[in-house]
């Protein structure tokens, strides 16, 4: 896989990698569970997955499913986070890697990255230029989505993340860039 990408990272740890597709709709949870039976699954990483996993899968893999979300959670959960950020007029936006729970985008945060919102996002006609503004936010955020997801995967695989009472902390917090 691409150097630095999730497949490359998994191969570096000699772990199998499965790509579940980028489409919307119901996830292929039967395939996911079949893979679990075939391999000793340490981690499920979701990137642009845009689907909601069933409680059965979430509970079975509690603390072992990492998602990347295009906002600084808890702000702007759910779909269209970049649009929500633009509509709210934020000056700082960002991305979050978090553990998946049955509550959408509410799981314990592992790492976040922030960026200044480009001033041009708020110039021009607010109705006509919305798509352009959202695209500008997405362009700034997407490279950070990959970065924060890979950082979270590394922290998880190194057993650096501890979750207690719905909150996460790092065993050696000073060793990681969290924001």
Where are these regions (language model features)?
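One-carbon transfer enzymes
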Residues: 1-179
């Amino acid at each position: 896989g691409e150097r630095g990408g999730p497949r490359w990272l998994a191969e570096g740890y000699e772990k199998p990698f499965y790509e579940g597709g980028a489409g919307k709709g119901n996830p292929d949870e039967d395939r996911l569970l079949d893979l679990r039976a075939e391999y000793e699954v340490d981690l499920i990483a979701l990137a642009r997955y845009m689907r909601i996993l069933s409680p059965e899968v979430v509970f079975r893999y509690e603390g072992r499913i990492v998602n990347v979300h295009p906002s600084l959670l808890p702000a702007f959960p759910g779909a269209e986070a970049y649009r929500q950020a633009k509509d709210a007029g934020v000056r700082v936006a960002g991305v979050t890697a978090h553990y998946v729970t049955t509550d959408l985008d509410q799981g314990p945060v592992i790492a976040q990255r922030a960026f200044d919102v480009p001033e041009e996002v708020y110039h021009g006609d607010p109705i006509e230029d919305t798509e352009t503004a959202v695209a500008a936010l997405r362009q700034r955020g997407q490279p950070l989505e990959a970065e924060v997801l890979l950082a979270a995967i590394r922290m998880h695989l190194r057993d650096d993340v501890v979750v207690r009472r719905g909150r996460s902390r790092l065993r050696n917090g000073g060793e990681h860039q969290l924001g």
